[in-house]
Amino acid sequence: MSTVGNSTNIFWQESPIGKTERQKLLNQKGCVVWITGLSGSGKSTLACSLSRELNNRGKLSYILDGDNLRHGLNKDLGFKAEDRVENIRRVGEVAKLFADAGLICIASLISPYRKDRDACREMIQNSSFIEVFMNMSLQMCEARDPKGLYKLARAGKIKGFTGIDDPYESPLNCEIELKEKEGECPSPVAMAEEVISYLEDKGFLQNE
């Protein structure tokens, strides 16, 4: 008998169709592209551009957007440290399922804490976890401020805002690092092409 978490008498039910068969059907390899960075660094912009470019190549992807998930799956969570940990854990579990289904899952979240991202990497399997660090300066992100959140944080209307009064821990060994150029975020297409080039080189866009 197996005991899982707080539940007892729970057993893992194997599927009659495995990941290998699903990948063969889709002619691609399931993986998780985990996009992390400050608010306003271009995470959602990259996620949307990447999904579009993959679709143009006949590859199936799905975006897990941090804000969108807080409308449903994670709507019961706030922004305290423990809630942020649980937020990332849940997204990691869902991303793992998408990758197992053979999809290219694009997770777009600030995910500020290194240990939480590393936990997702371990959960999903290192070889299928591609961490993309949007290495954009706080100054650039605050200047962009597409949602007006930095202005609210500076005014004291948002507490615990990443980059202002809560830390962001940069990745130490990410697969892809995208940097600003002359104080500007690279174009969406250019960023997407860099990620796609990595996926191609690592064999994720074909099933062999």
Positions of PLM-derived features:
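Conserved beta-strand scaffold positions in the cores of enzyme catalytic domains, especially
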Residues: 63, 129-131, 175-177
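The conserved Walker
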Residues: 39
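Conserved lysine of the Walker
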Residues: 43
